[in-house]
Amino acid sequence: MSSKKRSASSRRWLQEHFNDKYVIEAQKKKLRSRAWFKLDEIDNTDKIFKRGMFVLDLGAAPGGWSQYVVNKVGLKGKVIALDLLPMDSILGVEFLQGDFREKSILKRLLNCIGDKKIDVVISDMAPNMTGISSVDIPKSMHLAELAFDISRDILIPGGSFLVKVFQGEGFEQYLREMRSLFKKVKVRKPDASRIRSREVYIVATGLK
């Protein structure tokens, strides 16, 4: 992609972003990001979170999802958030910065979890997007697979997994794998997800 095309694309994205009703509403409500509204819509439909739950938030920064979940699980619940990027603290959320593919970070994460299993894993992880589908989609699928792999190891029986995926090559196979391990699997496209984006959210409940 030429620099001129990238520049035009960037300008269009910025214009859309600042005119976006969810961005405006997020600023009014002092929310970390517009992603809060995506999770709110999904949770209103699928009833994922309950008081007292133990939740792991992957790809958490800047904290929109953690901000939503910590209010849902309450004081008796627990939220662990993890991201490569730094994240400002949120009351009730334990944040780890790093890549869980690294042994040292994975060890810290498992120490935070302790003997208790996780009720829900949520992942809004996304790669640095290039705008080239043949590059972006395999990268996003790789992140979704990593989230899926760790979920299988740490979720309680009957636990839930919510993950962002970009539709394209590998998507149907990923869905089949999810359906083999969870009792119920749904694909959601919340209103706050931009129409042009290939992103969807897979809600998997009832780990077998």
Curated annotation (Swiss-Prot):
Keywords: Cytoplasm, Methyltransferase, rRNA processing, S-adenosyl-L-methionine, Transferase. GO terms for cellular component: cytoplasm. It is an enzyme of class 2 (transferase). It holds the Pfam family FtsJ. GO terms for molecular function: rRNA (uridine-2'-O-)-methyltransferase activity. It is found in: Cytoplasm. InterPro entries: RNA_methyltr_RlmE (IPR050082), RNA_MeTrfase_FtsJ_dom (IPR002877), rRNA-MeTfrase_E (IPR015507), SAM-dependent_MTases_sf (IPR029063). It comes from Hamiltonella defensa subsp. Acyrthosiphon pisum (strain 5AT). It comes from the Bacteria. This is Ribosomal RNA large subunit methyltransferase E.
